[in-house]
Amino acid sequence: MQERSIKRIILVCSVLCLLAAAAFANNNTKEENIDRGIRFTETNPPVAPVRPIAEFEPASAVLIRYPLGIPLSLVVQLANTANVICIVSSSQQNSAISAFTNAGVNMDKVSFINTITDSYWTRDYGPWFIFDGNGEYGVVDFVYNRPRPNDNLVPQIFANQLNLNYYGMNLQQTGGNYMCDGVNTAAQTNLVYSENGNNQTNVNTKMNQYLGITNYCVVADPNNTYIDHIDCWAKFLAPDKILIRSVPISHPQYNAIETTATYFANQNCAWGYPYRVYRVNTPNNEPYTNSLILNKKVFVPIVGSSNDNPALQVYRTAMPGYEVIGISQASSTPWESTDALHCRTHEIPDKNMLHIVHTPWHSIISAGTDIVFNVEITAHSGQPLYTD
């Protein structure tokens, strides 16, 4: 009797789930139903040599999702820094417009992409960006490492709506576990290997083909948390600068974090000399490395701790010329040690940027010595360059 009752309950639940799914599908717009028909397919890689675009490069926009995972006050600041592209379902767009308008967001800087999403973690499922060997801007997609099918479609929908070159890289990945230097280097935890069958050769090859990564720093996660995302403990601030969290010697992850910091201090950056490693104190697992660099501003999550101001000062010391802004959490979506501001936003690089490449002088020279700098300038806007 008990077994039969259980079977009946399961049957009723199954029917209710099917009805709910049908009702949800019927609320989709025609455009959103078309979006659901897109499926991931690996494409040919971009024309080599490929250059990955770093977070600290010029950005035209920032990608967020509504309902929000960030405070409305941050949306106001983002719209004063770049364009804001908001992913929202058609049924919720008016709600988003009302919330943004009431908060004082500059709506001239806001545009919408209508599609259904499963979560607000645009960092994790959003597109990655490259310039190919012909200087053409493009989106690199991947298989999102979470069972969120709507989120997994966002890079394709984004590329389609903005008419961008699209490349599908058949690796299971997540944006919170990826950072690059804008030259040839990427850093990730070894989650990338374990989620791709521990086939390191395959992962390394695809990262090179699709993103131009020739210097690949893959390390164990020193935080030893469930998520294994690198943005929970480190951040590239420039091609030769990396920020890594620090903790007291009594902290259970002290040894692992110090070992990782030493590893990066002994690695050469793309410019041929060791990384300058900056440390930010996180004794209570504060998410200070989980920040967003957007043009010349750095938005840092703060938690009302006495460690907030010293953390902001670390950024100011490491990044002269940037405005460093502390952002308090929304009570409904608080910052967490494994999920904060960086996880819920995603910069969109400027496809028309002026890209200037030169290797900084790093050694001591005598006074009066002439120095020759070789500089390569690319106007991705297609506009001519003028000599001075």
Q: Model segments located where?
A:
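Bacterial N-terminal signal peptides that target proteins for export
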Residues: 2-13
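Serine/proline-rich low-complexity intrinsically disordered segments, especially terminal tails, linkers
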Residues: 7, 16, 60, 293, ...
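Glycan-association/targeting regions that enable binding to alpha-glucans and other polysaccharides
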Residues: 349-388
